[in-house]
Amino acid sequence: MTKHIPIEVFTSVWWIGLLSSIFTIIVILVALKGKSNQVKSYSSYLFALLFSLMYVITNVITIKNNTWNLLQNLPFQICYISLIIGIIVLVNKKQWMFEWMVFIATIGGLYAIITPVLTIGNSAWFYFEFYFLHAGIVFIPLYLHNIHNMRCRFDSCWKTLLRVQISIVLLLIFNFSTGANYMFLIEKPIVNHIFLIGEWPFYVIIINLIVIGHVYLINKFIVSQ
């Protein structure tokens, strides 16, 4: 298993990752605003291709380094699940996938950028991949909302939460069966986080309740406006 390496908050690396993520998202959104439908369509395919290449290259590197294994490198973390959904929704514009990105990917991506932990390697590539991935899953719903005018449906937040609960149950079964720790459902990540309270299973329950609260707030104060 690859050692998990937290990036200390307020260090130069942390600031570079945070600010470059915010800057890149804003620049791309501003650049694409008001462009023709053809440009918007091409940009969706381009982003899907870039995210796909990033995922493939990262896995090739881990295989080459002999660090790839079933217990750590399957796309079963919430942000990798969101990445795959994000790649697909860029192409097919499926409504439920967009809603997943709004309610779940946004939360996961933002908190990952604020309290980053490298889980699959610590070379320069994995630093870049970490911020590319998590800024990407924050970017995708903003892009679809602002550039393609996609909107969430009424009560979509609760349907999205149901999908998350199903994912948690399935991954708990997988984790217990294999000894994996996908979505950190068995063991807490090694990062100082205000919401990581207590030991298993209490921190899982608390995080789940906090996610529900975040989704409710996003729905009430942003989506419903």
Identify the meaning behind each predicted range:
Residues 41-46, 73-75, 98-106, 130:
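Cytoplasmic-side transmembrane-helix entry/capping segments in multi-pass membrane proteins
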Residues 114-162:
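A contiguous pocket-lining binding segment that forms or flanks enzyme active sites
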Residues 51-60, 105-116, 164-175:
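Aromatic-anchored segments of alpha-helical transmembrane domains
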Residues 13-20, 66-79, 99-102:
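Structural signature of hydrophobic alpha-helical transmembrane segments
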Residues 32-44, 91-97, 147-158, 224-225:
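Membrane-interface helix-boundary motifs at transmembrane edges
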Residues 63-70, 92-96, 116-128:
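Membrane-interface helix caps and helix-loop-helix hairpins in membrane proteins
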Residues 4-21, 159-166, 176-215:
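Membrane-interface transmembrane-helix boundary segments in multi-pass integral membrane proteins
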Residues 17-28, 80-91, 133-147, 203-220:
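Hydrophobic cores of alpha-helical transmembrane segments in multi-pass inner/ER membrane proteins
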